[in-house]
Structure formats: structure tokens, C-alpha cells
Curated annotation (Swiss-Prot):
Protein name: Plasma membrane ATPase 1
Gene behind this protein: PMA1
Active site positions: 355
Bias (Acidic residues): 37-46
GO cellular component: plasma membrane
Keyword Lyase recorded: no
Function: The plasma membrane ATPase of plants and fungi is a hydrogen ion pump. The proton gradient it generates drives the active transport of nutrients by H(+)-symport. The resulting external acidification and/or internal alkinization may mediate growth responses.
GO biological process, one term: proton export across plasma membrane
Membrane-related topology note: Multi-pass membrane protein
UniProt cross-references to CDD domains, sorted A to Z: P-type_ATPase_H
Cytoplasmic side: 1-92, 138-268, 325-696, 752-801, 852-895
């Protein structure tokens, strides 16, 4: 076969060898099963950019590259494959032992081993390993994303080399190669069509996510992983490997994977602050001990005690358990959580960037009210259009399926259709832009039926005879109106026997919104969520979909972002543009990624939905990546949450649940920080002033009891906030400090009054350590009932799991005191009852203080302070960063 004479064996094949299926049965199947035949519409499941100079793209299509040229270009640009970065899993696991809380736990383990306190050593090491294993397992899955992207690439390619058409492995293609494209070709690289007078239909769903094929002519660009549906042409390769769109998408995924997650930053910030408190407390204790010439072993024991209680060693485990229980609950609602921290992020999401197809819409074409020429009945138009449709269920395209399913609304056309006999059927011709069928009516009349691009159908009629001016004008105006509203229009015409062609009208069709989407969008607004559409579809289609859903219609072409070296907006103007836009259409992976990144730079928590390979980078970049029903493997791997139920409503349900889970975590963190501050203040003062401390074993039990009792917080009854929730850390610290001080004062009063001759807690006998242990355990355990409530602590009934866990721990702590476990001696029941009563009094004081703080706007303002206005500086920084990005892009293109 010649390089310039592609085979035409499969071209112009009019009738398949397969028998036509019964039209009545086909229509019945399609109408009874809305998903019938749709499986073939679904998408396949599955470094640095090197621009190629234009002088290397002047290859003669008839000759191609020589072997020497191929060798030179392969040395310069490498193989046509994505770079593989081997991740060191051992190092990845070790990094989970790095962090403020982990450092304190490790220091405590070393101290415990040095003091031969093997019980404490074992407990601390077990907590360290538990936290590390949970984190490692959650993040290990991310490494499969690039592998899933690779599955979309072709395995072989037909190229012109040395004047001959040869088949080679796809990874051996180099820039400047001439590729032959034909029906079914999976394009292995990015390139530009060089054949004259050609027309291809290319499925770009792997890039744009939109299932309808697009037309490509001479000079148009084609992209790696796209599939040629119909037509033949030659293409010159302009980019290979990591420089292709799919390669750059993989690079964006790797870039998005880098860095520390939002929740990890919050925990590290809390741990770092507590570590500072620990260091300050230790300095005070050491100075006091050295002043009294205390021996080194007691000093080390004091250090171990303060280290254990100063940082909440169980914080990661309890928070992880809370999110894991929430993930199990979400799984029952068909939402699979792949990254636990996504639950926390989803609770604070303010902007949802949603893909259109399949999420907001049904991903199935449906017909709308047709335009008919005067004198033509809609049933006649529908009958003609359905006659010009394939009758084979296997391979039936989306448009024919939509017409046949809609026959239920046209009973006369449906009844007449089986009476016609198909003599000849010509599938869609990308050149004439029409589908043609020759049929025989029940009366024996031969009729030619066509449907296709409206203006091409109009020209067919005009070539046969003049059309009245008013009909012509109305027809063209209707085409323009449908196009402006985002409809895909199909013209319909017929020719009876030897008569003239008749123009019948136009049938508009589009992917309609899901039935529940409009209500769900309103619910999202009520929850303080802004929905922006990011789609690869046309601007007109996106606007019409937004109009039907009640979303804003400020939809723009994604090219207007101007982040690839074009555009004249400054960085701050681009950020304003993205922030105020209701969505972007005709976008590629980089456009979606950039939009998410810009919104994040403005301080928003962003969620992104998607289903295709093209969505993988933005799914990974978003604070919460959401793969919707039917998503490809690459999208599912990149996402934090995978939904098995269709539509946006499932996402809103998950949002409410995540806010409930966040409320539980926030309650626990306030509680746990207050506990750490309580014991640091009390023990630090006790050691510094009286040179005494609790038994180290009792301190360990206090820490364990605090976390064991509150593990049940994961099952607590919790409300969901009506607005996005975030970590208000200044306020959180303010509340924790006040509660910690109240706890410390309560314990100090217990210590200083228990040995008084009259009115003390202990009369003539009892253990000092035992009473303090009980008082600390009771007040700390009950504190969770204060922090979990949004109002007074009695306004919200805790779950039986939480109440039961706290009660069991309280009983165990009471037994410790009654029987003198790990303390000097046993304590009588009267003293224990007095301790319970006193502890309840401290609990009531904490409840009142917490309620006042949580409802006081003045307290919130005091904690947060007055932030200086930095908008000008921020906008200047945005301008500078975008300018540098454009310079970098232009430099890459010129090298």
C-alpha cells in the first residue's frame, strides 16, 4: 500500500452483512430499558514539556522520516511514553513517623525505655505504629493513577518511514513522523492533520469527557488517546510522551500529589503549638528541679510524665477512627471514601466544580420540541427521521437511539414505522454530513429519507429546487436559535418517488439535566455551596444546561483563562474572573486544573467532580476529588471519594454527613487540647512548687482513659452545620485554654483542700494519688459532653455508645481509687462520693463557660484579632506569579 493511497476497503460500506433486527422489537427494547445499548457509549475504562520547533515539522507526507532522522529525534525527545518515577515505599512509610506529635511520642518512648518502663514504652510504640499504618494504607493507592492514564494509550502505529508505510510500536514514534489515521485508530501522539480535503470524526472523550465525536479537517489538531470513528487522513506528530496532553495530565497528577494535605497541616499546627507548651513547661520544671538539686532519675520521670500528657498521643488514632466510621456510613450511601482526610475537606468545601455530562445531566441525548415547516406534521418529521436510522441494536449510535426511544411520544409515527421496508441504508457520511435511507412505503412508493446537519440538508433540497424565501429564512433563524441555546440540531428531508425534495423541519436534541439536579442545586445553595460548571462541551450547550438548572449563565470559553502564554489579563484579574464566573466550557485537563488551583489560591476549599481520564489532574488537585458513577479507572484512582449512585444529590448527602463527622472531630480536638493543657498546668505547677507528681503509671492510664472513652465520639449524635465548616484555630485554642485552666483550678483546689482537718475531701485516710486520679479522670471524661453540644450540654442527648463508654471508664477509674490500684492505699466510699460531687461541680462550671464562649461573637473576635488588609499585596503576588508562568510557557515554546 502506498503512503499516499490509504486503503478504502472499509470505506463506503453501505449495508452490513448482519440481518436487520425487527424494528418493533428494537423500539420496545429501547423504551422498556432506558439503558439498553448504552454500554457502547461509555468511555473506555481503561515531566517537562518539550515543544517541537516548526522546522522539524516539515516532513514530506509521501516520504516520511529516514532512519537517521528518527535516531536523532529519539535522542532529543526520548521514547513516546510517560516517564515512570519509582516511589520508595520504605521511605514513604518512614515519613509517617515525622511530625510534631510523632516526635514527642518518639521522645517519650526513648525516655520510657531508658527508665525501663516497658509498659509505657509498649503503649507509645503501638500508637505510633497504628497511626503510621493507617496513613500509609490510605495514601498507597495514589500511585496507581499514572498507570491508569497509560492504559488509554495506543500500542502500535502506522507510520511513513523511508517512503514506506510500516507498523511500529507506539512508543517508537518521534516528533515529525507521519501517521496514517483510519477507522478505529487510537491516536498514539499529539499531531496535526496534513491531508487535504479530508474529514475525520474523532472521539476525544478521553481528553474532554464529552462522548460525541468532533470533526477534524486539514490543519486541525488531534490528541493522544483519541479514537478515529470515521474517515482517513495523515497526521504529522507534534508531541510525544510527557509532552502530549495525556502526558501533561499525568504530570499534573504528580504535581497535585505533592505537598501536605489540608488536614495534615491542621494536625501538625496543633501538634507544634502543644510541643511549644511542653517545652516551656519542661523548662520551668527543670529549673525548679535543678534549684532543689533533684536527682536525674526523678527529673527524667517528671519529663516523661509531662511529655506523655503534654501532647495528645491518641489524637491521630481517635480522629482516624472517627473518619473511618464515617467512611463506613458513607459506603452504605454508595459513596466509597478512598482517602479519609477527604471527609474533613468535604465538610469545608465552599465551591463545587462539577463536570456537566453524567453529573448534572443524564449523559443520554433526548429530543425536544421540533420545528416543522408549515404544512408538515411532527409525526411525519419523526417518521422520516426514524426511517433514516440504523435498525441494528448493536452499534446503534446515540442519535438514532434518542429518536427511536422518543417514538413513544409520536404514536402515529411509531405505528407506521414497521410498515416501511428498508431497501438501502447509508450510515452517517462525514463529508455530506447526512444519514440516508431508501425505503419502500406500504403502497409501494420509493422514498429517500435523510437527516443530518441542518444546513447540509437544506443545501440538498436547494440543489433540487428553489425554496421559498420565508421558509428559507425561518429555517436558518431556527438553526441559529437552537445553536444559541446549546441544542444539537438535525435537519430532516425526504424525496417521494420522482418528486422534488421536501424540507420537513429541524429536530433539536441535547443531553438533558437529571430530574433531581435543579432541586439539588438549590439545596447546595442552602448549604452555602457554590456550584461552577467545568466542561469540555461547547459554550452554548453549557449555558443552556445552566439556564435549565437555575445556575448562573456566566459561562466562558476556557481559553480565556490565558494561562498558557496568551491573554492580557493580570494574575489578580484572572483570579477575579475565575472567582466570579459560573463555569468554563470547551476546557482541557490543564484548564480545569488551573481553575481549581486559582480558586484554592483565593483561600477556598474546592471539590471537583469528574468521570474521565481528562478529569484526573483536577480531581487530584482539588481538596476533595469526587469520581461520579461510571467513572474510568484513572478518575477513580485520582479521586478521594467514588460515588456509585448517579447525580449530584448523592454528593449533597455526603456533604451533610461529612459536616456531622467534622463536628465530632472538632468537639474531640477542643476536648483533647484542653486535657493536655490541664495536666501540663497542674503537673508543672505541682512539680515546680511542691516537688511532687502523680505516679507515672496513673498518668499513662489517664491518657489512655481519655482516648478510649472518646473513641465512641465516632458514633455520637451530631448535627450538620448549615454552612461550610473550617478549623477556626484561634477560637479553638481560646476555648481549649479556658477549659484547661478551669480543669487545672478544679484539680488544684482538690489537691490543696483534701488534707484539711475539716471540710477536706480526705478525712483520716485515703490515697493522695488515688483521689487526684479519680478527680482528673471524671472531669476530663465529662468534658466531652460539654464540647459535643452546640448549645448547653443538656440540650443535646449523646449517643448510647458515647455515654456507655464514658460510664465504663468512670467505673474503672473509681475502682482504681477504691482499691488503691497503682496508688498508696485504698480510699473509702464516702471520699469517692465527695470526689464525684466536686467533679460534677467543676463540670457545670465548664459547661457554662463553654456555652458563653461558643455563643459570644466578642470572644470569637478577640481570639481571631483584627486581621490587616493584605488584598493589594496578594493581588500583586498573583500578577507576578501569572507573569512568570507566561514567560516560562513562552520560553518552553521557543526552545
Amino acid at each position: 500500500m502506498s503512503a499516499t493511497e490509504p486503503t478504502n476497503e472499509k470505506v463506503d460500506k453501505i449495508v452490513s452483512d448482519d440481518e436487520d433486527e425487527d424494528i418493533d422489537q428494537l423500539v420496545a427494547d429501547l423504551q422498556s430499558n432506558p439503558g439498553a445499548g448504552d454500554e457502547e457509549e461509555e468511555e473506555e475504562n481503561d515531566s517537562s514539556f518539550k515543544a517541537v520547533p516548526e522546522e522539524l515539522l516539515q516532513t514530506d507526507p509521501r516520504v516520511g522520516l529516514t532512519d537517521d532522522e528518527v535516531t536523532k529525534r529519539r535522542k532529543r525527545y526520548g521514547l513516546n511514553q510517560m516517564a515512570e518515577e519509582q516511589e520508595n515505599l520504605v521511605l514513604k512509610f518512614v515519613m509517617f513517623f515525622v511530625g510534631p506529635i510523632q516526635f514527642v511520642m518518639e521522645a517519650a518512648a526513648v525516655l520510657a525505655a531508658g527508665l525501663e518502663d516497658w509498659v509505657d514504652f509498649g503503649v507509645i510504640c503501638a500508637l505510633l505504629l497504628l497511626n503510621a499504618f493507617v496513613g500509609f494504607i490510605q495514601e498507597y493507592q495514589a500511585g496507581s493513577i499514572v498507570d491508569e492514564l497509560k492504559k488509554t494509550l495506543a500500542n502500535s502505529a502506522l507510520v511513513v518511514r523511508n517512503g514506506q508505510l510500516v507498523e511500529i510500536p507506539a512508543n517508537e514514534v518521534v516528533p515529525g513522523d507521519i501517521l496514517q489515521l483510519e477507522d478505529g485508530t487510537v491516536i498514539p501522539t499529539d499531531g496535526r492533520i496534513v491531508s487535504e480535503d479530508c474529514l475525520l470524526q474523532v472521539d476525544q472523550s478521553a481528553i474532554t469527557g464529552e462522548s460525541l465525536a468532533v470533526d477534524k479537517r486539514s490543519g486541525d489538531s488531534c490528541y493522544s488517546s483519541s479514537t478515529v470513528k470515521t474517515g482517513e487522513a495523515f497526521m504529522i506528530v507534534t508531541a510525544t510522551g510527557d509532552s502530549t496532553f495525556v502526558g501533561r495530565a499525568a504530570a499534573l497528577v504528580n504535581k497535585a500529589s505533592a505537598g501536605t494535605g489540608h488536614f495534615t497541616e491542621v494536625l501538625n499546627g496543633i501538634g507544634t503549638t502543644l510541643l511549644v507548651f511542653v517545652i516551656v513547661t519542661l523548662l520551668v520544671v527543670w529549673v525548679a528541679c535543678f534549684y532543689r538539686t533533684v536527682r536525674i532519675v526523678p527529673i527524667l520521670r517528671y519529663t516523661l510524665a509531662i511529655t506523655i500528657i503534654g501532647v495528645p498521643v491518641g489524637l491521630p488514632a481517635v480522629v482516624t477512627t472517627t473518619m473511618a466510621v464515617g467512611a463506613a456510613y458513607l459506603a452504605k450511601k454508595q459513596a466509597i471514601v478512598q482517602k479519609l482526610s477527604a471527609i474533613e475537606s468535604l465538610a469545608g468545601v465552599e465551591i463545587l466544580c462539577s463536570d456537566k455530562t453524567g453529573t448534572l445531566t443524564k449523559n443520554k441525548l433526548s429530543l425536544h420540541e421540533p420545528y416543522t415547516v408549515e404544512g408538515v406534521e411532527p409525526d411525519d418529521l419523526m417518521l422520516t427521521a426514524c426511517l433514516a436510522a440504523s435498525r441494528k441494536k448493536k452499534g446503534l449510535d446515540a442519535i438514532d437511539k434518542a429518536f427511536l426511544k422518543s417514538l413513544i411520544n409520536y404514536p402515529r409515527a411509531k405505528a407506521a414505522l414497521p410498515k416501511y421496508k428498508v431497501i438501502e441504508f447509508q450510515p452517517f457520511d462525514p463529508v455530506s454530513k447526512k444519514v440516508t435511507a431508501i425505503v419502500e412505503s406500504p403502497e409501494g412508493e420509493r422514498i429517500i429519507c435523510v437527516k443530518g446537519a441542518p444546513l447540509f440538508v437544506l443545501k440538498t433540497v436547494e440543489d433540487d429546487h428553489p425554496i421559498p424565501e420565508d421558509v428559507h429564512e425561518n429555517y436558518q433563524n431556527t438553526v441559529a436559535e437552537f445553536a444559541s441555546r446549546g441544542f444539537r440540531s438535525l435537519g430532516v428531508a425526504r424525496k417521494r418517488g420522482e418528486g422534488h425534495w421536501e424540507i420537513l423541519g429541524i429536530m433539536p436534541c441535547m443531553d438533558p439535566p437529571r430530574d433531581d439536579t435543579a432541586a439539588t442545586v438549590n439545596e447546595a445553595r442552602r448549604l452555602g455551596l457554590r456550584v461552577k460548571m467545568l466542561t469540555g462541551d461547547a459554550v452554548g450547550i453549557a449555558k443552556e444546561t445552566c439556564r435549565q438548572l437555575g445556575l448562573g449563565t456566566n459561562i466562558y470559553d476556557a481559553d480565556r483563562l490565558g494561562l498558557s502564554g496568551g491573554g492580557d489579563m493580570a494574575g489578580s484579574e484572572i483570579a477575579d474572573f475565575v472567582e466570579n464566573a459560573d463555569g468554563f466550557a470547551e476546557g482541557f485537563p490543564t484548564n480545569k486544573y488551573n481553575a481549581v488551583e486559582i480558586l484554592q489560591s483565593r483561600g477556598y476549599l474546592v471539590a471537583m467532580t469528574g468521570d474521565g481520564v481528562n478529569d484526573a489532574p483536577s480531581l487530584k488537585k482539588a481538596d476533595t476529588g469526587i469520581a461520579v458513577e461510571g467513572a474510568t479507572d484513572a478518575a477513580r484512582s485520582a479521586a478521594d471519594i467514588v460515588f456509585l449512585a448517579p447525580g449530584l444529590s448523592a454528593i449533597i448527602d455526603a456533604l451533610k454527613t461529612s459536616r456531622q463527622i467534622f463536628h465530632r472531630m472538632y468537639s474531640y480536638v477542643v476536648y483533647r487540647i484542653a486535657l493536655s493543657l490541664h495536666l501540663e498546668l497542674f503537673l508543672g505547677l505541682w512539680i515546680a512548687i511542691l516537688n511532687r507528681s502523680l505516679d507515672i503509671n496513673l498518668i499513662v492510664f489517664i491518657a489512655i482513659f481519655a482516648d478510649v472513652a472518646t473513641l465512641a465520639i465516632a458514633y455520637d449524635n451530631a448535627p450538620y452545620d448549615p454552612k461550610p465548616v473550617k478549623w477556626n484555630l484561634p477560637r479553638l485554642w481560646g476555648m481549649s485554654i479556658v477549659l484547661g485552666i478551669i480543669l487545672a483550678i478544679g484539680t488544684w483546689i482538690t489537691l490543696t483542700t483534701m488534707l484539711l482537718p475539716k471540710g477536706g475531701i480526705i478525712q483520716n485516710f485515703g490515697g493522695l494519688d488515688g483521689i487526684l486520679f479519680l478527680q482528673i479522670s471524671l472531669t476530663e471524661n465529662w468534658l466531652i459532653f460539654v464540647t459535643r453540644a452546640q448549645g448547653p450540654f443538656w440540650s443535646s442527648i449523646p449517643s448510647w455508645q458515647l455515654s456507655g463508654a464514658v460510664l465504663i471508664v468512670d467505673i474503672i477509674a473509681t475502682c482504681f481509687t477504691l482499691f488503691g490500684w497503682w496508688s498508696q492505699n485504698w480510699t473509702d466510699i464516702v471520699t469517692v462520693v465527695r470526689t464525684w460531687i466536686w467533679s460534677f461541680g467543676v463540670f457545670c462550671v465548664m459547661g457554662g463557660a463553654y456555652y458563653l464562649m461558643s455563643t459570644s461573637e466578642a470572644f470569637d473576635n478577640f481570639c481571631n484579632g483584627r486581621k490587616p488588609q493584605q488584598h493589594t499585596d496578594k493581588r500583586s503576588l498573583e500578577d507576578f506569579l501569572v507573569s512568570m508562568q507566561r514567560v516560562s510557557t513562552q520560553h518552553e515554546k521557543s526552545t
